Each structure stands twice: as structure tokens, then as C-alpha cells.
Amino acid sequence: HRGEAQAEQWLRGVKTNLARKAAGGDRDVARDILGGICDIGLANAYYVGHMKNAAAGTDARKWGDGIKAIRPTFAQTGGTHVNISGAAVAKHAPHKDNAVKLLEYLVSEPAQALYARANYEYPVRANVAQDPVMQALGPLQVDPLPIAEIAKHRKQASQLVDKVGFDQ
């Protein structure tokens, strides 16, 4: 959103504020917060749903209950990054009609409700409710920057990570 110089400054700031070298996965972030290793962390939202709905007495449930999750928004755009998934049918697919039917089902209300309920994903259909755990995080404001624009800068972003030694 703000160019390479500010991206580098931001990345250096994140690195400077790391409690330890970045490692592990989304559940590890919650574990580290609960363990006092760090005060905040970044994780995919659906892990919050998995942890908060884990079986009572498990580490995952303890981690989920021990964190306060928020949906961050960027001041300039008023939105937050969301991961996306895509699907396509190959031009020469031998069973094209069935492939299209599968894709149509995947975006249907029943399938989207299943994704929301079973995996705490954000439905692509506005008329499908989010899981209550996800709703409790507040409204989702999606960063409007098109993925094609983000993709244009992937190589530069990777080079910045190397330049600031983020993984060292």
C-alpha cells in the first residue's frame, strides 16, 4: 500500500519486536502468548475457532481460551488481509461437466455453511452465517487491494525479507 521503503521499515520493525526468531505455526503463537514469551502474535483466524472449540482440558482449548483474538485493520484502507482460495477446470478436462458441478457445489449455501461450521472459514456467500466464534471477532473488513496487485510485488517482498535478514 505504501511502497517499498515503508514496507522495509515495517518489516524491520516487526523483526525488532519479535520475542524470538519466527518459528512454528498458528497454534504455537497462542501457546507462546499464554506462556509469556510474547504479548501479541499473528495467526490465521480459523485456528482461533479450532482452539476455542477444542475438547475441554486439551492444550489447544487452553491456548484458545487464553488469547484475545482481533481482526486487525490497516488505517489507510480500513481492511485486513484475507487468504484466498481458487479453483478452475482445465481446458481439456475429461469430465468437464462433473468438474463444473463440483465447483458449483463448493460455492453453494450448504457447502459454504459446512466450511464455516466445520473449519471456521469465512463463507464466500454473504447469506451464509459465520461460526459464532468467528462472529465474536467482529465484522470482517477485507483489504480491497486486488490479489493481482499483491502478486506483482511478491518477488520484491521476498527480496526485502532477505535484505532485512528476517529469518535470521
Residue ranges and their predicted role:
Residues 130-168:
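Extracellular/periplasmic bilobal clamshell ligand-binding domains
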Residues 45-49, 74-77, 93-94, 108, ...:
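Solvent-exposed loop/turn segments at secondary-structure junctions
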Residues 1-72:
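Ligand-binding pocket segment of bilobal, Venus flytrap-like solute-binding proteins
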Residues 5, 24-27, 42, 92-97, ...:
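Soluble non-cytosolic domains of exported or imported proteins
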Residues 85-145:
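Mature extracytoplasmic/periplasmic domains
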